[in-house]
Amino acid sequence: MSNPADSDIARRGFLKTLASAAATLPLPPPNAAAAIAGASAATVATTSATVSAQTAGNPADGYQYFSIEEAALVEAVVDTMCPADQLTPSGTACGLATYIDRQLSGSFGNGGRTYMAGPWQTGKPQQGYQLSLDPKSFFSAGAVAAQASCQTTTGKKFQELSPTDRDAFLHSLSDGKITSERVPLAQWFNDLLYPLFEQACFADPIYGGNRDKVFWRMVGYPGLPAFNTLNVKEFRGKPFPDAKQPKSIQDFS
């Protein structure tokens, strides 16, 4: 019988394996990207209207943007990629879903720093974000498509799967093995959801994730860069003495 702790550690391989998978993933097929990228204005309008109807004015308890279904999906995702074990609490307990929700409800989610005037064409990886939906709408469209694909392939919603099956489904998303005619799901996962997960782990706790600085403590990061600038040279490659008590923005407010 395998050790549950060993299984949890193995599932943390997401932090290593998905980074390389995202870098080498081919572009989604044109018919998948076109539905979102704007080749069909009617499709984009329908997708956007559907997404807006599902989320507007009806956030799940404790969230600013997520609908109830989105909250259930994201909480299951972050708990799969960050399981509760001897290293950290679960992803939800660490505030990872809260961080993602806040990013989508704010300037980032609304495309505040993204050129959104078109024209909409399938771009190359080096050209960055090329879709006609703002990030929050792309997230919601992807969440619907991912959940539908999960139910089609497994007969269950993602949050109803076992931890092992959730892990396998997420890897299939990342590898481009799970597809949708309406949404480029590999791009959705690798370029939007997973980067937000990484940010949630290591951002300052003031933004909702990394609760109690748990990830900073885990890797020995001392906290606010400006506070430790003078120590970088002295402690380069060595454990920092105060890393067990890292400092965040709130500690100086």
Tell me what each language-model feature is.
Residues Y63-Y65:
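Start-of-domain signal
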Residues S52-A60:
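Short, contiguous pre-domain boundary segments
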Residues P30-T50:
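Signal peptide processing junction and immediate N-terminal pro/mature segment
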Residues S2-A5, N58-P59, E69-A76, L87-S253:
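Mature-region segments of soluble proteins
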Residues N3-L25, P29, A33:
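N-terminal secretory signal peptides and thylakoid transit peptides that target proteins
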Residues L15, S48, V74-A76, T80:
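Short, charge-rich amphipathic segments
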Residues S20, P26-P28, C82, Q103, ...:
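Functionally constrained cores in energy, signaling, and assembly domains
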